[in-house]
Each structure stands twice: as structure tokens, then as C-alpha cells.
Regions:
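Conserved acetyl-CoA-binding loop-helix of GNAT-fold acetyltransferases
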Residues: 75-78, 84-101
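Short beta-strand-to-coil "C-cap" segments at the C-terminal boundary of structured domains/repeats
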Residues: 166-169
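Conserved acyl-donor/pantetheine-binding loop and adjacent beta-alpha core of acyl/acetyltransferases
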Residues: 43-75, 119-120, 125, 143-158
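Conserved active-site alpha-helix within GNAT-family acetyltransferase domains
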Residues: 100-106, 113-142
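A short, well-structured alpha-helix characteristic of acyl/acetyltransferase catalytic modules
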Residues: 1-4
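Active-site rim helix/loop that mediates acceptor-substrate recognition in acyltransferases
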Residues: 7-37, 45
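Conserved hydrophobic beta-strand within the GNAT/NAT acetyltransferase core sheet
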Residues: 73, 107-109
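Short hydrophobic/aromatic beta-strand or adjacent loop that forms the aromatic wall/cage
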Residues: 29, 159-164
Length: 169
């Protein structure tokens, strides 16, 4: 699902397994799943920011923000056929509840920054900004980090800017 706009992420399974291991090995992390019968059709992750990626922690430290107060919301992936049926709202509700149980007072996630005129952008693409604002999140474009990944069609990883959305819980 990350192969689609705006991420255009071309993942190798070995890298994804290693990435997901950080959630599996963190007793304070959570993975929320969406099912259609017995089949997983979506997943969403979170963990205390203090346990998260150095790129995320460093962005907050550079701004004088205390990472120990934040829950970092990682991925939210949902098959296209199951969107618009409440799973996205449930992903946020469950992760926010998990953060509160951990005693965390803030939630944060980041989204990739793309040129709105990029020719690879599908004509029917609808950004999720409105959905996130309806959940109470505020965009902070000046709070950002960089992650490296290989885009679909590329042969090497390149840096990508991601900006943060925050909410007090």
C-alpha cells in the first residue's frame, strides 16, 4: 500500500520485517489490525516516541520538545476497498487509548511532503489532511524529519522530508 502516492515506497520484505521487529520487541508498542472476516485488511502501529526512530526523536529534541510525553503513530495501512468504513477512525481511537494507558499526553505522526504539482500524483488523489484535522491533529510543517527509502522505479534510496501532525490527548 505504500507503493501508492504519496509515498511511492518500494519495499523489500527483509527491510520490512526488520522495521516491524521494533514494534514486536517493544512491550509498550501496539499494532492495531483491521479484519474482513479472518483476513487482515489493514494495520496501524504506535509506540512511545522515546522508543521510536532516532530521526523522529532528534526532530523533536531539536525543537526542545520532550519526546517522553509523546506517542509516535507509525504506519496506518488499509486496503483501498475497506476505506471509508470506519477503520481509519478506529486506528486513531485505539492508538490514542493505548497512549493514554501508557500515561502519554501527546500524539504525533508524520506524513511525507510532496510537491503538489508532481506529475506522478494521481488526478483523483485526496489528501488525508481533512481527516487528520477532524481527529484533532494540527499540522506543524516546520517540525520535520527525513527518512530514506527507494521509490518505485528507482534503484537507490533517496531522502524524503516528512512533517509532523500533533495532538494533545
Amino acid at each position: 500500500m505504500f507503493r501508492d502516492w504519496p509515498y511511492l515506497y518500494d519495499a523489500e520484505e527483509t527491510g520490512e520485517v526488520g522495521y516491524m521487529r521494533q514494534y514486536a520487541e517493544d512491550p509498550r508498542a501496539a499494532v492495531v489490525l483491521a479484519f474482513d472476516g479472518d483476513r487482515v485488511v489493514g494495520a496501524s502501529t504506535c509506540q512511545p516516541m522515546a522508543s521510536s526512530h532516532p530521526e523522529v526523536r532528534d526532530a523533536f529534541a531539536a525543537r526542545g520538545l520532550d519526546a517522553s510525553r509523546f506517542c509516535y503513530f507509525g504506519e496506518s495501512l488499509l486496503e483501498r476497498a475497506h476505506r471509508g468504513q470506519g477503520a481509519g477512525v478506529a486506528f486513531f481511537t485505539e492508538r490514542e487509548a493505548h497512549a493514554r494507558r501508557l500515561g502519554l499526553t501527546q500524539a504525533a505522526f508524520c506524513s511525507v511532503v510532496r510537491n503538489p504539482n508532481d506529475p506522478r500524483k494521481p488526478a483523483d488523489y485526496t489528501p488525508l489532511d481533512g481527516f487528520w484535522r477532524n481527529r484533532g491533529y494540527v499540522h506543524h510543517p516546520d517540525l520535520a524529519c527525513r527518512f530514506h527509502w527507494r521509490e518505485v522505479g528507482d534503484d537507490r534510496e533517496t531522502p524524503h522530508l516528512l512533517s509532523f501532525w500533533l495532538r494533545t490527548l
